[in-house]
């Protein structure tokens, strides 16, 4: 459960991301594909080369979903219900992949905002991404 302090930390961190959210989403996806090659199996139709339009496009979708989640931290299940359905029933993404992407998002944010990436911010973002992952995998049961 996200505390009030966690929610404030997440909001502050995401505000720093600003207009680069889509770029960071794409970078996190590239990190995931390079670090965890099995994740590529869900994107057989994508050009996974560095800077590809498809990875950038999906990175923007990831970032938009996270921006939506940041704006609805008090109702993540409601805010992410359609996305949860999509990933569980249509795409059938292995739930572990959300954890892998979460890790890559943390690394990406830390690399771009090292001064702001304090232990408290890190912990709050980690809890937030875990909460989002839990909601996205809730329909698998």
Swiss-Prot record:
Please list the residues that carry the modification N6-acetyllysine: 16
Q: Name one GO molecular function term.
A: peroxidase activity
All residue ranges annotated as the Globin domain in the record: 1-141
UniProt keyword annotations, A-Z: Acetylation, Heme, Iron, Metal-binding, Oxygen transport, Phosphoprotein, Transport
Task: Report if keyword Calcium is assigned.
Answer: no
Q: Which GO terms describe its cellular component?
A: blood microparticle; haptoglobin-hemoglobin complex; hemoglobin complex
Q: Which residues carry this modification: Phosphoserine?
A: 3, 35, 102, 124, 131, 138
Q: In which tissues is it expressed?
A: Red blood cells.
Q: Please give the residue positions where the record annotates the modification N6-succinyllysine.
A: 7, 11, 16, 40
Entry's InterPro entries?
Globin, Globin-like_sf, Globin/Proto, Hemoglobin_a-typ, Hemoglobin_oxygen_transport, Hemoglobin_pi
Q: Which residues bind O2?
A: 58
Per the record, the similarity remark reads:
Belongs to the globin family.
**Assembly and binders:** Heterotetramer of two alpha chains and two beta chains.
Briefly, what is this protein's role? Involved in oxygen transport from the lung to the various peripheral tissues.
Protein name, UniProt field: Hemoglobin subunit alpha
- Could you tell me the gene encoding this protein? HBA
């Amino acid at each position: 459960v996200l505390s009030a302090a966690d929610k404030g930390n997440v909001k502050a961190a995401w505000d720093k991301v600003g207009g680069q959210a889509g770029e960071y989403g794409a970078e996190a996806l590239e990190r995931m594909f390079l670090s965890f090659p099995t994740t590529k199996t869900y994107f057989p139709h994508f050009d996974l080369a560095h800077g590809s339009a498809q990875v950038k496009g999906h990175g923007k979708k990831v970032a938009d979903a996270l921006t939506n989640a940041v704006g609805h931290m008090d109702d993540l299940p409601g805010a992410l219900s359609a996305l949860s359905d999509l990933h569980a029933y249509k795409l059938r993404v292995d739930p572990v992949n959300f954890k892998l992407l979460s890790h890559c998002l943390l690394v990406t944010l830390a690399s771009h905002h090292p001064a702001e990436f304090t232990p408290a911010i890190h912990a709050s973002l980690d809890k937030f991404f875990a909460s989002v992952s839990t909601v996205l995998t809730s329909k698998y049961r």
